[in-house]
């Protein structure tokens, strides 16, 4: 692996993907040539983040990178997801992309799943944030010039008053002790509106707050919960 190794960045629109992209490039782990995102085909929004497709397009434009979109039905089963991703990864492999980067931090099962999926098409994974202290990562986000706001919270962990908060040292001081500072367990999700690798900041306007409840697919209620989403817009793409 060198500076010219072609890498696809799995892009969620949030801070972890942005920081992983920043570190990957800065540390010479490879060259990001594509962004890859999964979207709800019903709503044209990023899964769980709730970010509009137009905002994703704006991020990609600011990064001057092509954005590959995998659109999936609501609550896709594993087979549908795997088939869609394998088609996309196979196409990237044919274009000379040999690595896929992720913003995962400590979820072992997810990392193994991704690596097994990549191995099927002869690709490998890069995890620039892996096993790093999440409080340190929040400080690194702020220190590196990445600017992000919270756009989704799991109501089991955070109240809707956290929506719109910036990810910075002030947030770090206010986050409850049972919440991972990076939201690695799905406690919250973010949107990046500025980064060192953006050509310019993305102006955003906040809209309504929406509450949605999701049921555990197997009906055992083990993760039934509600989420608050902050709708955001870019005036440039209204």
Positions of PLM-derived features:
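Nucleotide-activated chemistry modules centered on ATP-dependent adenylation/adenylyltransferase
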Residues: 1-238
